[in-house]
A protein has these predicted regions:
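Conserved mid-domain beta->alpha element of the FAD-binding
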Residues: 9-22, 30, 145, 249-335
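Conserved Rossmann-like nucleotide-cofactor binding loop
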Residues: 12, 35, 150
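Conserved N-terminal helical subregion
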Residues: 2-4, 21, 46-157, 161-178, ...
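C-terminal helical "tail/cap" subdomain of flavin- and related membrane-associated enzymes
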Residues: 1-2, 90, 283, 298-396
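Glycine-rich FAD pyrophosphate-binding loop
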Residues: 21-41
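Flavin-binding catalytic cores
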Residues: 219-252, 306-307, 315, 319
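Active-site substrate-recognition segment that forms the wall
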Residues: 186-218
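Conserved hydrophobic helix-helix packing surfaces used for dimerization/oligomerization
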Residues: 4-6, 27
Length: 396
């Protein structure tokens, strides 16, 4: 039986374990924490990730706990619609609590025979598949490094590459759902260099994210400053969102970005944030991890030479993640670094982006990857309902 070591038990690590174990590999997962858990609030899963979860036999289990969104809207601070996109089977978006997703993945991985070792931090990794775990040596034919944006493996193998970090961060929080979120619609409000997203993620809870530049101390503070956010988003203030969020436990994270010189070296592959951490502006953090780990399992399971298989995997598929990273950063730039003197022009840009099917198909290429068949599907003819851009009197 072929054997693999997976370093990390987040979405990428557990997905890699499921994909490999389902193809007959013996898999050991090493997690540095005392438990397998996910810190955060909600997480969006799009078509590429949903197809992987279906292949894992998890889609029905996930559906019981998630919200299937039917529409995505971008609005200015007063609630005027800048962009509106209907969501359906050809471009689906689901929202689920991160912890529930992790539990489902963990259960499936262990059902398939993967073994999880907690309190097992990785000290060092070698090209030949040897891994030092708290001073003890273990080895495998394949090592999958899913150890996050600050990856020990990436650094140890000399795969770090300098990259300009995003200048934004987000507070993520779960709040009680109210009548204002009765519909299964994700809404994102823009005001200057701030953004607030609101999306139902269970029948009783809403996932909200509050985005601000890192140098905005009041915007990055937790618990959130109700008055600060309410003054900049009057529509959401009227809905009582900030009062609800202020009493909940939110977590602030700087937007990540990783640019590795290579995803592979020897018998080691970087996956998830260790390979391609990116701002969450396109909702593809989980999707890329699920997609790339399943693709990786196809390559290493169909070839006897692991380094050769890993090189082919990266050659054939890295471009999707690269493009997604580029456009996720550009989308964040529109918020965090757009010149205030031309905010009215920004509204027109958002409107134009939403109106172009061809551009959306290019920017959102990751949504269309079917890792099961190893194909990129045709761009969906999703329904855009953009009206006219907001007037120059709105500063969005």
């Amino acid at each position: 039986m072929r054997n693999a070591i997976v370093c990390g038990s987040g979405v990428a690590g557990l997905s890699a374990a499921i994909a490999l174990a389902s193809k007959g590999w013996s898999v050991n997962i090493y997690e540095r924490s005392s438990t397998v858990r996910e810190i955060g609030a909600g997480i969006f899963i799009k078509g590429n990730g949903l197809r992987v979860l279906e292949g894992f036999g998890l889609l029905d289990r996930i559906r019981r706990d998630c919200i299937v969104l039917r529409e995505a809207r971008t609005l200015d601070k007063n609630g005027n619609i800048l962009q509106q996109r209907l969501l359906h089977e050809s471009n689906p978006v689901w929202n689920i609590q991160r912890e529930l997703l992790i539990r489902a993945l963990l259960a499936r991985a262990t059902e398939l025979g993967a073994r999880v070792h907690t309190d097992s931090s990785v000290d060092a990794i070698s090209l030949d598949g040897r891994v030092s775990i708290r001073g003890s040596q273990v080895g495998a034919e394949l090592v999958v490094a899913a150890d996050g944006a600050n990856s020990v493996a990436r650094h140890a193998l000399g795969l770090d590459r300098s990259a300009r970090k995003p200048l934004s961060g987000a507070i993520r929080v779960l709040v009680p759902r109210s009548s204002h979120e009765a519909e299964n619609i994700v809404r994102e409000f823009w005001s200057g260099r701030l953004r607030v997203g609101v999306s139902p993620c269970t029948a009783t809870e809403v996932f909200s994210y509050l985005i601000a530049p890192l140098n905005d101390q009041r915007g990055a503070r937790t618990p959130i400053e109700t008055e600060y956010w309410a003054a900049r988003f009057p529509r959401l203030a009227a809905e009582g969102l900030f009062q609800r969020a202020a009493v909940e436990e939110g977590v602030h994270h700087r937007y990540p970005f990783v640019s590795a010189s290579s995803w592979t070296r020897g018998c080691v592959a970087l996956v998830g944030d260790a390979a391609h951490a990116l701002p969450p502006t396109l909702g593809q953090g989980a999707g890329l991890s699920l997609m790339n780990t399943l693709l990786l399992s196809h390559y290493v399971s169909s070839r006897s030479d692991v380094p050769e298989a890993l090189a082919a995997w990266e050659h054939d598929w890295r471009w999707v993640s690269n493009r997604t990273q580029i456009w996720a950063r550009r989308y964040d730039w529109i918020t965090s670094e757009w010149p205030p003197s031309v905010y009215a022009l920004r509204n027109a840009v958002i409107w134009a982006i939403g109106k172009s099917r061809r551009f959306n198909g290019y920017m959102r290429v990751a949504d269309r990857v079917d890792a099961l068949s190893r194909k990129v599907l045709p761009a969906p003819r999703f329904t855009l309902q953009t009206g006219e851009p907001a007037s120059n009197g709105s500063t969005g």
